[in-house]
Design a protein with these regions (language model features):
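Single conserved hydrophobic/aromatic residue that forms the stacking wall/gate
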Residues: 1-10
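Hydrophobic/aromatic-rich transmembrane helices and adjacent perimembrane loops
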Residues: 17-21, 210-233
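Membrane-interface transmembrane helices that cradle and orient dolichyl/undecaprenyl
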Residues: 24-39, 75-78
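Membrane-interfacial loop-to-transmembrane alpha-helix junctions, especially the N-terminal start
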Residues: 31-43, 83-90, 181-194
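Membrane-interface alpha helices of multi-pass inner-membrane proteins
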Residues: 41-69, 87-100
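Membrane-lumen/periplasm interface segments of specific transmembrane helices
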Residues: 87-167
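Membrane-interface helix-loop-helix junctions at transmembrane boundaries of multi-pass membrane enzymes
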Residues: 170-195, 232, 240-241
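Transmembrane-helix signature of polytopic, lipid-linked glycan biosynthesis machinery
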Residues: 194-213
Length: 243
């Protein structure tokens, strides 16, 4: 039946970013040493951004950046400033790939079809990023974050609350134990990564409000960052106990 066919297409489209994220993480786990030693991670994130832009129709693209970032900071340990520089560099690489592919599609379409695609694209960007309902940007951003959070069932909210409580509890524990200096360099980029989906929603709030039924999935980046945060603290505590 036609309706079933359309449903299958919708499901496939909704899974594009998740498939790309899983493929990216799997590739990192298999080839991390080579990527790290040859300094190829910027190119790796550039390619992820390009593929996301090419295959996805602005569903929850930021997951293809945030979750691989969490994976990277689980695999690598460096000084705080170096970690922040890497985080900024990887985000910039992904952003260049993502925005560059979108721009290339617009330019090629405009040059070949002469349909005014570039002008339409600019107006589309303005429309998708404008503040929702005439609110101030930050006020509207928090409102849209709430809309996206409401897309999750209650039990997911409870699970997220427990996850946050565990993370905060462990952080207090390592501060009391005097271990904060040993682990903060690893935790700092993870905390910044957790903020990425919220910054995305605030920046692209009109789109995120209009399509909250699928954009809410980008908040999985915050959950992944919280889990990474917990794993890094537990790993550090175990390491200190052995020493």
């Amino acid at each position: 039946p036609r309706s079933r066919g359309l449903g299958d297409v919708y499901k496939r489209q909704m899974s594009v970013c998740w498939i790309l994220t899983l493929l990216a993480v799997e590739y990192m786990l298999l080839h991390h040493d080579r990527l790290h030693e040859k300094g190829q991670y910027p190119e790796f994130f550039l390619i992820i951004g390009i593929l996301t832009s090419y295959f996805d129709f602005l569903t929850y693209p930021i997951t293809t950046l945030g979750i691989p970032l969490c994976c990277y900071f689980l695999l690598e340990n460096d000084r705080a400033w170096n970690n922040i520089k890497k985080l900024i560099g990887f985000c910039a690489s992904w952003g260049i790939g993502y925005a560059g592919m979108w721009a290339a599609k617009w330019v090629i379409a405009d040059l070949t079809l002469h349909t005014g695609t570039i002008k339409d694209a600019i107006w589309s960007i303005i429309g998708r990023t404008e503040a929702i309902g005439g609110r101030p940007r930050m006020n509207g951003g928090f409102y849209v974050i709430g809309l996206n959070l409401h897309e999750y069932p209650v039990y997911m909210g409870i699970a997220a609350g427990i996850l946050a409580a565990v993370a905060v509890g462990l952080m207090v524990m390592i501060i009391v134990m005097g271990r904060w200096k040993n682990v903060y360099a690893q935790l700092l980029p993870v905390v910044v990564t957790a903020a990425i989906p919220f910054a995305w929603i605030i920046a692209v709030q009109h789109h995120s409000a209009l399509h909250a039924r699928f954009t809410f999935r980008i908040l999985s980046v915050a959950a992944a960052a919280a889990i990474t945060f917990i794993v890094l603290i537990v790993r550090n505590v175990k390491k200190c106990q052995k020493n």
